[in-house]
Protein backbone atom coordinates (compact mmCIF):
# COMPACT_ATOMS: atom_id res chain seq x y z
CA UNK A 1 0.00 0.00 0.00
CA UNK A 2 1.37 3.40 -0.99
CA UNK A 3 1.63 5.83 1.93
CA UNK A 4 -0.67 8.79 1.37
CA UNK A 5 -1.67 11.65 3.62
CA UNK A 6 -5.41 12.32 3.74
CA UNK A 7 -5.31 14.70 6.70
CA UNK A 8 -7.28 12.32 8.93
CA UNK A 9 -4.79 12.12 11.80
CA UNK A 10 -6.58 12.04 15.15
CA UNK A 11 -10.03 11.61 13.60
CA UNK A 12 -12.44 8.90 14.75
CA UNK A 13 -13.54 6.48 12.02
CA UNK A 14 -16.23 3.78 12.24
CA UNK A 15 -16.46 1.22 9.43
CA UNK A 16 -19.20 -1.39 9.04
CA UNK A 17 -18.17 -4.50 7.15
CA UNK A 18 -14.68 -3.65 8.34
CA UNK A 19 -13.34 -7.18 8.77
CA UNK A 20 -12.79 -7.93 5.08
CA UNK A 21 -12.71 -6.56 1.55
CA UNK A 22 -13.23 -2.87 0.95
CA UNK A 23 -14.01 -2.13 4.60
CA UNK A 24 -10.78 -3.72 5.81
CA UNK A 25 -8.76 -1.92 3.13
CA UNK A 26 -10.32 1.39 4.20
CA UNK A 27 -9.49 0.64 7.83
CA UNK A 28 -5.88 0.04 6.84
CA UNK A 29 -5.60 3.35 4.99
CA UNK A 30 -7.25 5.34 7.78
CA UNK A 31 -5.02 3.71 10.41
CA UNK A 32 -1.92 4.45 8.35
CA UNK A 33 -3.08 8.07 8.19
CA UNK A 34 -3.23 8.29 11.99
CA UNK A 35 -6.98 7.95 12.55
CA UNK A 36 -8.63 6.07 15.42
CA UNK A 37 -10.47 3.21 13.74
CA UNK A 38 -13.35 1.01 14.90
CA UNK A 39 -14.39 -1.88 12.67
CA UNK A 40 -17.82 -3.49 12.97
CA UNK A 41 -18.68 -7.05 12.03
CA UNK A 42 -20.66 -10.14 12.97
CA UNK A 43 -17.84 -12.65 13.47
CA UNK A 44 -15.51 -12.46 16.46
CA UNK A 45 -13.07 -14.76 14.66
CA UNK A 46 -12.90 -12.59 11.55
CA UNK A 47 -12.70 -9.52 13.77
CA UNK A 48 -9.66 -10.92 15.56
CA UNK A 49 -8.04 -11.84 12.24
CA UNK A 50 -8.69 -8.35 10.89
CA UNK A 51 -7.13 -6.70 13.95
CA UNK A 52 -4.00 -8.86 13.61
CA UNK A 53 -3.76 -8.02 9.91
CA UNK A 54 -4.12 -4.29 10.53
CA UNK A 55 -1.50 -4.38 13.28
CA UNK A 56 0.92 -6.24 10.98
CA UNK A 57 0.35 -3.87 8.07
CA UNK A 58 0.35 -0.55 9.91
CA UNK A 59 1.87 -1.15 13.34
CA UNK A 60 -1.27 0.43 14.77
CA UNK A 61 -4.29 -0.98 16.54
CA UNK A 62 -7.92 -0.75 15.55
CA UNK A 63 -10.84 -1.81 17.76
CA UNK A 64 -13.35 -4.49 16.79
CA UNK A 65 -16.99 -4.07 17.83
CA UNK A 66 -19.49 -6.88 17.29
CA UNK A 67 -22.56 -5.57 15.47
CA UNK A 68 -25.20 -7.01 13.16
CA UNK A 69 -26.25 -3.88 11.28
CA UNK A 70 -29.59 -5.42 10.34
CA UNK A 71 -30.61 -5.11 13.99
CA UNK A 72 -31.43 -1.58 15.11
CA UNK A 73 -30.71 -2.31 18.78
CA UNK A 74 -27.24 -3.69 17.98
CA UNK A 75 -26.38 -0.59 15.96
CA UNK A 76 -27.34 1.63 18.88
CA UNK A 77 -25.40 -0.55 21.32
CA UNK A 78 -22.29 -0.57 19.11
CA UNK A 79 -22.22 3.21 18.78
CA UNK A 80 -22.85 3.60 22.51
CA UNK A 81 -19.92 1.27 23.22
CA UNK A 82 -17.66 3.33 20.96
CA UNK A 83 -18.78 6.53 22.69
CA UNK A 84 -17.97 4.93 26.05
CA UNK A 85 -14.51 3.89 24.86
CA UNK A 86 -13.84 7.37 23.51
CA UNK A 87 -14.58 8.60 27.04
CA UNK A 88 -15.56 12.19 26.28
CA UNK A 89 -19.04 13.74 26.54
CA UNK A 90 -18.30 15.85 23.47
CA UNK A 91 -17.10 12.86 21.41
CA UNK A 92 -17.52 13.32 17.68
CA UNK A 93 -17.74 10.56 15.08
CA UNK A 94 -15.73 12.17 12.31
CA UNK A 95 -16.11 9.55 9.58
CA UNK A 96 -18.72 6.80 9.19
CA UNK A 97 -18.13 4.32 6.37
CA UNK A 98 -21.13 2.12 5.58
CA UNK A 99 -19.38 -0.78 3.86
CA UNK A 100 -21.38 -3.81 5.01
CA UNK A 101 -23.06 -5.44 2.04
CA UNK A 102 -24.61 -8.63 0.74
CA UNK A 103 -24.72 -10.03 -2.79
CA UNK A 104 -26.41 -13.01 -4.36
CA UNK A 105 -27.08 -13.47 -8.06
CA UNK A 106 -30.72 -14.44 -8.49
CA UNK A 107 -33.15 -13.82 -11.31
CA UNK A 108 -36.48 -12.24 -10.43
CA UNK A 109 -38.46 -15.43 -11.01
CA UNK A 110 -36.31 -17.22 -8.42
CA UNK A 111 -36.74 -14.71 -5.60
CA UNK A 112 -38.66 -15.49 -2.44
CA UNK A 113 -39.80 -13.02 0.17
CA UNK A 114 -36.99 -14.28 2.42
CA UNK A 115 -34.44 -13.56 -0.34
CA UNK A 116 -35.80 -10.04 -0.71
CA UNK A 117 -35.68 -9.38 3.02
CA UNK A 118 -32.16 -10.78 3.45
CA UNK A 119 -30.61 -8.50 0.85
CA UNK A 120 -32.68 -5.44 1.68
CA UNK A 121 -31.94 -5.85 5.38
CA UNK A 122 -28.17 -5.68 4.94
CA UNK A 123 -27.80 -3.33 1.98
CA UNK A 124 -30.46 -0.76 2.89
CA UNK A 125 -31.87 -1.16 6.40
CA UNK A 126 -28.47 -1.89 7.90
CA UNK A 127 -27.01 1.27 6.41
CA UNK A 128 -29.93 3.35 7.65
CA UNK A 129 -29.90 1.79 11.13
CA UNK A 130 -26.18 2.41 11.68
CA UNK A 131 -26.36 5.96 10.34
CA UNK A 132 -29.38 6.63 12.54
CA UNK A 133 -27.50 5.36 15.59
CA UNK A 134 -24.53 7.57 14.72
CA UNK A 135 -26.56 10.76 14.19
CA UNK A 136 -26.12 12.19 17.72
CA UNK A 137 -22.34 12.04 17.24
CA UNK A 138 -22.17 13.37 13.68
CA UNK A 139 -21.29 17.00 14.24
CA UNK A 140 -19.58 19.84 12.41
CA UNK A 141 -17.36 18.56 9.58
CA UNK A 142 -18.33 14.91 10.09
CA UNK A 143 -18.55 12.66 7.03
CA UNK A 144 -20.61 9.69 5.93
CA UNK A 145 -19.37 7.56 3.04
CA UNK A 146 -21.79 4.93 1.73
CA UNK A 147 -20.68 2.04 -0.46
CA UNK A 148 -23.05 1.20 -3.31
CA UNK A 149 -22.09 -0.43 -6.62
CA UNK A 150 -21.88 0.20 -10.34
CA UNK A 151 -25.07 -1.90 -10.32
CA UNK A 152 -26.82 1.18 -8.94
CA UNK A 153 -26.13 3.17 -12.10
CA UNK A 154 -25.98 0.43 -14.76
CA UNK A 155 -28.22 -2.63 -14.72
CA UNK A 156 -26.53 -6.01 -14.35
CA UNK A 157 -27.90 -9.30 -15.64
CA UNK A 158 -29.41 -11.71 -13.18
CA UNK A 159 -29.36 -9.53 -10.09
CA UNK A 160 -32.33 -7.16 -10.24
CA UNK A 161 -32.79 -7.22 -6.47
CA UNK A 162 -29.15 -6.39 -5.79
CA UNK A 163 -29.32 -3.53 -8.30
CA UNK A 164 -32.46 -2.24 -6.58
CA UNK A 165 -30.83 -2.25 -3.14
CA UNK A 166 -27.75 -0.41 -4.40
CA UNK A 167 -29.96 2.09 -6.22
CA UNK A 168 -31.61 2.72 -2.87
CA UNK A 169 -28.18 3.46 -1.37
CA UNK A 170 -27.59 6.13 -4.02
CA UNK A 171 -30.99 7.71 -3.34
CA UNK A 172 -30.41 7.53 0.43
CA UNK A 173 -27.04 9.26 0.01
CA UNK A 174 -28.49 12.16 -1.95
CA UNK A 175 -31.40 12.66 0.44
CA UNK A 176 -29.21 12.41 3.54
CA UNK A 177 -26.73 14.91 2.11
CA UNK A 178 -29.56 17.44 2.00
CA UNK A 179 -30.89 16.50 5.44
CA UNK A 180 -27.52 16.81 7.20
CA UNK A 181 -26.14 19.86 5.39
CA UNK A 182 -24.36 22.11 6.10
CA UNK A 183 -22.64 20.41 9.04
CA UNK A 184 -22.20 16.86 7.73
CA UNK A 185 -21.08 15.72 4.29
CA UNK A 186 -22.52 12.53 2.76
CA UNK A 187 -21.10 10.86 -0.34
CA UNK A 188 -21.28 7.51 -2.08
CA UNK A 189 -18.76 5.27 -3.83
CA UNK A 190 -19.94 2.91 -6.58
CA UNK A 191 -17.27 0.29 -7.27
CA UNK A 192 -17.52 -2.36 -9.96
CA UNK A 193 -15.86 -5.75 -9.45
CA UNK A 194 -13.21 -5.70 -6.74
CA UNK A 195 -10.68 -8.43 -5.99
CA UNK A 196 -12.08 -9.51 -2.63
CA UNK A 197 -13.08 -12.80 -0.98
CA UNK A 198 -16.70 -11.91 -1.81
CA UNK A 199 -15.98 -11.85 -5.55
CA UNK A 200 -14.07 -15.12 -5.34
CA UNK A 201 -17.06 -16.69 -3.62
CA UNK A 202 -19.43 -15.29 -6.25
CA UNK A 203 -17.38 -16.87 -9.03
CA UNK A 204 -17.28 -20.19 -7.19
CA UNK A 205 -21.05 -20.13 -6.66
CA UNK A 206 -21.77 -19.25 -10.30
CA UNK A 207 -20.64 -22.69 -11.53
CA UNK A 208 -19.94 -21.23 -14.96
CA UNK A 209 -16.21 -21.78 -14.98
CA UNK A 210 -15.56 -18.03 -14.92
CA UNK A 211 -12.24 -16.78 -13.60
CA UNK A 212 -10.99 -13.38 -12.49
CA UNK A 213 -9.28 -13.11 -15.88
CA UNK A 214 -12.64 -13.58 -17.62
CA UNK A 215 -14.17 -10.83 -15.49
CA UNK A 216 -11.23 -8.49 -16.09
CA UNK A 217 -11.52 -8.89 -19.87
CA UNK A 218 -14.80 -6.93 -19.82
CA UNK A 219 -13.07 -3.79 -18.53
CA UNK A 220 -11.39 -1.13 -20.68
CA UNK A 221 -8.45 -1.24 -18.24
CA UNK A 222 -8.35 -5.04 -18.63
CA UNK A 223 -8.33 -5.63 -14.90
CA UNK A 224 -10.55 -5.31 -11.87
CA UNK A 225 -9.93 -3.04 -8.91
CA UNK A 226 -7.90 -3.89 -5.85
CA UNK A 227 -9.71 -3.20 -2.59
CA UNK A 228 -6.96 -0.69 -1.73
CA UNK A 229 -7.91 1.41 -4.76
CA UNK A 230 -11.51 1.72 -3.59
CA UNK A 231 -10.27 2.48 -0.08
CA UNK A 232 -8.22 5.35 -1.49
CA UNK A 233 -11.37 6.91 -2.95
CA UNK A 234 -13.22 6.47 0.35
CA UNK A 235 -10.44 8.18 2.29
CA UNK A 236 -10.18 10.95 -0.29
CA UNK A 237 -13.91 11.68 -0.08
CA UNK A 238 -13.75 11.89 3.70
CA UNK A 239 -10.58 13.98 3.72
CA UNK A 240 -10.87 17.57 5.01
CA UNK A 241 -9.46 18.80 1.69
CA UNK A 242 -12.64 17.62 -0.06
CA UNK A 243 -14.83 19.83 2.11
CA UNK A 244 -17.06 21.00 -0.78
CA UNK A 245 -18.11 17.51 -1.88
CA UNK A 246 -21.46 16.28 -0.63
CA UNK A 247 -24.28 14.37 -2.28
CA UNK A 248 -21.75 13.08 -4.82
CA UNK A 249 -21.95 9.62 -6.39
CA UNK A 250 -18.46 8.54 -7.40
CA UNK A 251 -18.23 5.62 -9.81
CA UNK A 252 -14.95 3.69 -9.64
CA UNK A 253 -15.26 1.04 -12.33
CA UNK A 254 -12.23 1.05 -14.61
CA UNK A 255 -14.30 2.55 -17.41
CA UNK A 256 -16.91 -0.24 -17.39
CA UNK A 257 -19.88 2.14 -17.61
CA UNK A 258 -18.15 4.70 -19.85
CA UNK A 259 -19.60 3.43 -23.09
Protein language model annotation of sequence segments:
Residues 12, 19-20, 43:
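Conserved glycine-rich cofactor-binding loop
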Residues 107-108, 112-117, 215:
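Substrate-binding pocket helix/loop in short-chain dehydrogenase/reductase
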Residues 109, 154-160, 222, 240:
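Active-site loop immediately N-terminal to the catalytic Tyr-X3-Lys motif
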Residues 128, 137, 223-252, 257:
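C-terminal substrate-recognition "lid" of short-chain dehydrogenase/reductases
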Residues 131, 165, 173:
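Active-site helix of classical SDR
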Residues 136, 177-182, 243:
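Alpha-helical segment proximal to the catalytic Tyr-Lys
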Residues 149:
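Residue(s) in the substrate-gating loop at a strand-loop-helix junction
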Amino acid sequence: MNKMNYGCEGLCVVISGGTSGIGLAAAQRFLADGARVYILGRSEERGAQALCYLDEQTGKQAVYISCDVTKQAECKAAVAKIAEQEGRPDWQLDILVNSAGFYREQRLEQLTEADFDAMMNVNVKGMMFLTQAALPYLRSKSNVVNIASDAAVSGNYGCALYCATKGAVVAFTRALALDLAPSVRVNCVCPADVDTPLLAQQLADANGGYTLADVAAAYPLQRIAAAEEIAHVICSLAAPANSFMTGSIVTVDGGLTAG
